[in-house]
Each structure stands twice: as structure tokens, then as C-alpha cells.
Amino acid sequence: MNINKYIDHTLLKADSVQSQLDQLIEEAKAYDFASVCVNPCWVAYAAKALKGTDVKVCTVVGFPLGATTSATKAFETKDAIENGADEIDMVINIGLLKQGDYQAVEDDMRAVVEASGDKLVKVIIEACLLTDDEKVKACQLAVNAGVDFVKTSTGFSTGGATVSDVKLMRQTVGPDIGVKAAGGARSLEDALAFVEAGATRIGTSAGVTIMKGEVANGGY
């Protein structure tokens, strides 16, 4: 298994600066990670720096609360793609899901899918805020909306990915939709446990630590 190709090497902190982006990009090149996941303001910079490599540029939409309008999320998506994004990680409208407004949640996801063209869309369900029934419903709505991946977490709420959530999400979406475990992979052991549970992508700031077989303290 090439665990490096599962990793979205992530830097989403509000106070991240260009020197940290440069380090992230160089590490992603060195380890041939699947992508770098960066905030929208850094997409054009990352895309230019990674041109000619296999490393994709991933960014976030409606992040981290998911509470912007669908039109805003669609605009963010188009803007990110124009700037060079290959993959879009959007946050669902969690409040609408919890109050049972399922069609609105699905339509919100679909707005981003339609805005993305042929680019990859991952939807973040923020599993730490949901009951198991809500997690299942969110994944079902995501499949209906035509997304490419479901993703556990933003890394900015009360918890990150768990093995049990990854298993439940994989069981719900079946074999043809990706599952991204985000937040919580601090070591190679963690990463392998998520893959064993059904993850096909891992969002983490500890990608280098994982590749070295070490354990990270803190981070995403």
C-alpha cells in the first residue's frame, strides 16, 4: 500500500503564512502526497508551485461552519477552480440537517457539485456534531447529490475522525464513493486503521510524521 497517495497534506489554520505553505508544498512534492489542502486564498499560489507534479490542489468551501448560502458556496467553488483547485471540500449545512430539512441539504450539496464541473467534490458532514442516524442520512443525501467523497470532519469542531464513523460512512455510501477521514490521524497506525475501516483519503497535517512512522503531537 502506498499510504502517501491517501494523504491530503493539510494546512487550514487561520494564521498560516506563506513560509508554512512553502514547507507544505515541498513536503507534498517530496512524499508525492495525493494533494495539499489549503485555504482558498492560497489556491493560486499552490497551483503555480505544484504545476508539473502529480500533487493535486484541494481547498475548502463554506468552511468551517457550512452555514453560508448555497449561492455563496457555488461562487466559492467556481472561484477556487478558476484559481487552480482540483478538489473541493465543502461543509454541509449542519443545522438544516439536524432540523430535518433534507431537501435543502441535498440541494446545497448539489449546488457545489454543479459548480465544480469535472472537479472532485468531497462533502464534510462534521460527524462529531451528528447522531449515527444523522450521519447515515447525510451520507445518503450526499450520494443523491452526486458527490465524489464524504468526509468526516473539518478539524475545527469538537472532534475529528473516528474509526467507527469511517466504518459507518463506508457502509452507508457503498464501494463507489470515497470516504475521507479528517482530523485524528497522528501516526501511521492511525492512518492504517482508517484505511482498514474504509477510508480512501486521509486529511492530516501530520503527513510527514506518518510517512516517517512517528507520532505527531497535536495538529489536524
Curated annotation (Swiss-Prot):
Keyword Cytoplasm assigned to the entry: answer is: yes
Which catalysed reactions does the entry list for this protein? Answer: 2-deoxy-D-ribose 5-phosphate = D-glyceraldehyde 3-phosphate + acetaldehyde
Its GO biological process annotations read: 2-deoxyribose 1-phosphate catabolic process; carbohydrate catabolic process; deoxyribonucleotide catabolic process
The protein's Enzyme Commission number: 4.1.2.4
Q: What InterPro entries does this protein's entry cite?
A: Aldolase_TIM (IPR013785), DeoC (IPR011343), DeoC/FbaB/LacD_aldolase (IPR002915), DeoC_typeI (IPR028581)
Recorded metabolic or biological pathway in which this protein acts: Carbohydrate degradation; 2-deoxy-D-ribose 1-phosphate degradation; D-glyceraldehyde 3-phosphate and acetaldehyde from 2-deoxy-alpha-D-ribose 1-phosphate: step 2/2
- State any GO CC term: cytoplasm
Q: Which residues form the active site?
A: 89 (proton donor/acceptor), 151 (schiff-base intermediate with acetaldehyde), 180 (proton donor/acceptor)
What is this protein's function? Catalyzes a reversible aldol reaction between acetaldehyde and D-glyceraldehyde 3-phosphate to generate 2-deoxy-D-ribose 5-phosphate.
> What protein name is recorded for this chain?
Deoxyribose-phosphate aldolase
